[in-house]
């Protein structure tokens, strides 16, 4: 299955947990969630608004935009590639009786670092 996301900002976090869970109804096993873009990432963490803002602020401090990275000579988005590299492009979650076996506060979060764009997320039940 594939999800299509339309991001609205250059940098944002979108909770895709419910969409992924709909993809695995009546399944058991594992689900692989993968983003095929080099300027996006996937993580599992709490979806509380303050934490999401903290994550974005932390990533910006860690890898600031427009700091003269070599790749910026081509596309002005080197920071987005570096941020995505640090976080990774996939997560794997156990599925039990059609439900994601996530912890109480855990959510699957899609991170956009070079939007706004239309993005794909591949969801593969294993």
From Swiss-Prot:
It holds the Pfam family UPF0047. Belongs to the UPF0047 family. This is UPF0047 protein AF_2050. It comes from Archaeoglobus fulgidus (strain ATCC 49558 / DSM 4304 / JCM 9628 / NBRC 100126 / VC-16).
């Amino acid at each position: 299955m594939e999800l299509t996301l339309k991001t609205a900002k250059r940098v944002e976090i979108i909770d895709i947990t419910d969409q992924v869970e709909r993809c695995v109804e009546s399944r058991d096993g594992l689900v692989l969630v993968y983003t095929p873009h080099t300027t996006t990432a996937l993580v599992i963490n709490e979806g509380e608004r303050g934490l999401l803002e903290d994550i974005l602020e932390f990533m910006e401090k860690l890898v600031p935009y427009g700091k003269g990275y070599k790749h910026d000579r081509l596309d002005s988005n080197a920071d987005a590639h570096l941020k995505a590299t640090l976080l990774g492009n996939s997560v794997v979650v156990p599925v039990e009786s059609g439900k994601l076996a996530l912890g109480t506060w855990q959510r699957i979060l899609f991170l956009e670092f070079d939007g706004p764009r239309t993005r794909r997320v591949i969801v593969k039940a294993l």
